[in-house]
C-alpha cells in the first residue's frame, strides 16, 4: 500500500514539474506550425487555452487555431468559432478586426452561408469603418452570391459613359 502511495505522489510531482507555461505552449505551437505539424500545433494552442484561460496569449492562440483550421480547410466551423471568440472576448486585440473580416469571408466563400456572411461583413463595417480591409468588406458585400467569373467580368468590362452599363460589343470584319 505504501509503495502505491509513493508511486502516486512521485507521478504527481513529475506531472506538476513538467507542466509547460503559457509562453512555452505558445512557442511550442509556433514551432510545430512552422514544421507543418498541424495537429500537434493545434494541441499546443488548445492546451494553452485550457490551462491558461487568462493568459495574454489566448487571443493569439485563438487566431492561430482559426488560421490553421482555415488554411488547411480542416474545420471551417472551428475557425469561425475561434475568430468569434476573439471578436467577442478581446475586441481591442490587434487581431480582432482581421478575425471579424475572416468570419464573413469564411461564411461567404467556404460555407456559402450568404446571410451569415452579410451579418459578419456589416458588423465589420460598423465596428471598423476606417480599417484598411473595409473596402474589401464592401466589395464582398456587393458581390455576395456571385461566382468568381461574374466578378471578373464585372471588373474587366468597361462601362459605357454615364450609363452604368457595359457597352454592346461589336465585331469588326
Model-derived features: positions:
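Sec-dependent signal peptide recognition
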Residues: 2-8
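Acidic, polar-rich low-complexity tracts and alpha-helical solenoid repeat scaffolds
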Residues: 5, 14-173
